[in-house]
Design a protein with these regions (language model features):
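Alpha-helical repeat scaffolds
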Residues: 41-45, 80-101, 159-167, 207-218, ...
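Short coil turns that delineate tetratricopeptide repeat
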Residues: 53-55, 109, 174, 221-223, ...
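Bacterial Sec-dependent N-terminal signal peptides
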Residues: 1-29, 251
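Post-signal peptide N-terminal segment of secreted/secretory-pathway proteins
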Residues: 32-154, 160
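Alpha-solenoid helical repeat scaffolds
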Residues: 58-63, 180-199, 225-233, 259-267
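Residue at a conserved register position within TPR or TPR-like alpha-solenoid repeats
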Residues: 30, 68, 143, 150, ...
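Structural signature of alpha-solenoid helical repeat scaffolds
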Residues: 52, 127-128, 185, 205, ...
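TPR repeat positional signature
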Residues: 23, 61, 68, 136, ...
Length: 274
């Protein structure tokens, strides 16, 4: 009896696994179709992304990214044909695609049972992500501007979205997928995006995000001094006096003409009789 029950359990597990793998294949087929039903494709792949049988497969996340890429391409095709199109959908698809491809690459880098890494996704996915970086910037600017027209929770919600776009742009530069590109050195736009990420985070008082992204902007000739302001403010808000004072001193050395650092350091010494 136990053997029969065990066999039934195995059959059920196998059927569930097959069903989810079928969802992944069907979602991919829909996305690659002539008139794709993206809502259906997303419904199928979202099930696979959370199912224990398929959520750890690189292919699942690759298909999720493909759906977003195809959805963005469809909107751009409509724009080219002068048909109604959804600009925000293009931006959101670019953002989601990047995140899905990041996860795909992470899983594909796990060595197989022989200890070998066979990542068949990196080359094409990294090229696609690089091509979509402009839409991450545009999406961030769009939501940042929307936030400036609102107040309270509504503004915070849009600033959070803006930060997500800007942060993902920066995350590309530090992702192992793009190690050969050396984007931290070659991407001249990145410091500006890091500044905007810090600015969006500052508006929400999201100090951990400031401390994560502002350093990528602190050496920039145009916005570096403001990025260091954000860093100092975040360190003070988090109660790290030692690092806060160190950041003020570093700011004075890097940007002696910028009064923020010297003024706050003098105030600290005056208030503490030093």
């Amino acid at each position: 009896m136990k053997r029969v029950l065990f066999s039934m359990v195995l059959l059920l597990v196998a059927s569930f696994t097959f069903a989810q793998e079928k969802n992944v294949k069907e979602a991919k087929s829909i996305a690659n179709g002539v008139n794709p039903d993206f809502a259906k494709a997303e419904e199928l792949i979202n099930q696979a992304l959370t199912n224990p049988e398929t959520k750890d497969n690189a292919e699942t996340w690759d298909v999720a990214g493909l759906i977003q890429r195809k959805r963005s391409e469809k909107e751009m095709e409509n724009a080219y044909l002068r048909k109604p199109y959804d600009t925000l959908q293009v931006y959101n698809s670019a953002l989601n695609m990047c995140k899905f491809y990041f996860k795909c690459d992470e899983l594909a880098q796990i060595p197989n049972e022989k200890g070998k890494i066979k990542n068949k996704y990196r080359k094409s996915n990294s090229a696609t992500i690089l091509a979509e970086r402009g839409n991450l910037i545009n999406g961030g600017i769009q939501f940042f501007n929307l936030a400036s027209q609102k107040e309270g929770d509504a503004a915070n919600e849009d600033n959070k979205k803006a930060l997500d776009f800007f942060a993902t742009y920066i995350d590309i530069a530090i992702n192992p997928m793009f190690e050969k590109e050396n984007l931290l050195q070659t991407d001249t736009v990145l410091p500006q995006i890091a500044y905007y990420a810090s600015l969006a985070a500052a508006k929400m008082e999201d100090y951990p995000s400031i401390l994560k992204y502002a350093p990528y902007a602190q050496d920039d000739k145009e916005v570096g001094k403001y990025a260091m302001e954000f860093i100092s403010t975040a360190l003070k808000a988090e109660g790290d006096t030692v690092k806060w004072i160190a950041s003020l001193k570093e700011g004075i050395q890097k940007y002696p003409e910028h009064s923020f650092f010297f003024g706050h350091l003098i105030d600290y010494y005056s208030n503490n009789n030093k």
